Amino acid sequence: IKPLMGFVLNHRYHRELLEDSNVCKIVKQLILSYPITEETNNLDYEYARYVTDILEKGNDNDFAADLNRKLIEDFNKGYLHGNFDGIYSVLVKKYRDVIWDDFESAFVSDDYYGFLFQIKDEIGSGTSFGVGALFQVKDDKVQNMCKKYPGKAPLRVAQMIPVFKDGHTFSDWFMWMLDEFGDQKDVLDSLHANMGTFTWGGSIIPLLRKKMECLNGIKNHRRVEVREWVEMCLQEIEEDMRRELNREEY
């Protein structure tokens, strides 16, 4: 399979090949048969770029559904060293309705946490301030999943949502999680962890002040659990601020 996939990738710029329905069918079957393992494979990166391109430029729902099921199983086998970013961003946006049932089942399953670990930074916010692909589509699928699986989905979603809307307030997603599931300690812990995952260059004091401003804005939240959590976060940030100021002065 790998030598054949290598041949296809070497000719990936010959888009006219995929205009032949028979060739296109063979290529897609080859993609679905491609072995994804823990072993580093030099083809993995090019494979991911090629598959992403096919998904973006095509409209084959059956292929997208089959690919989603394949990746759920393959990504769950162990930590993958290959870079497969790009594929799931397209799947959860363009083919959302097609893949959702299988995706949702895997997302909330403890047996498929390896799969979630592999994709969460790509389709979530990761270490950036942006909005991940999972949250770029304006529908109720993620919210409904959280309500359907309140013991599993919210704490996982909380790790992936965008934290800030602007320089002064938390994002709508962040506020929704607090409003709906702020009575769950696991969810609050996940939100706390999410606030601490940013990649930041230079002094972190501006980031700490940004967090403090957002937290001060929800000190009077209707949930007592959230109010207590806010106080805990503020105390922690104030300690971080003092430590950082002392370090910079030194």
Task: Cite the ranges covered by each PLM segment.
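Non-catalytic all-alpha helical scaffold/repeat segments
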Residues: 1-250
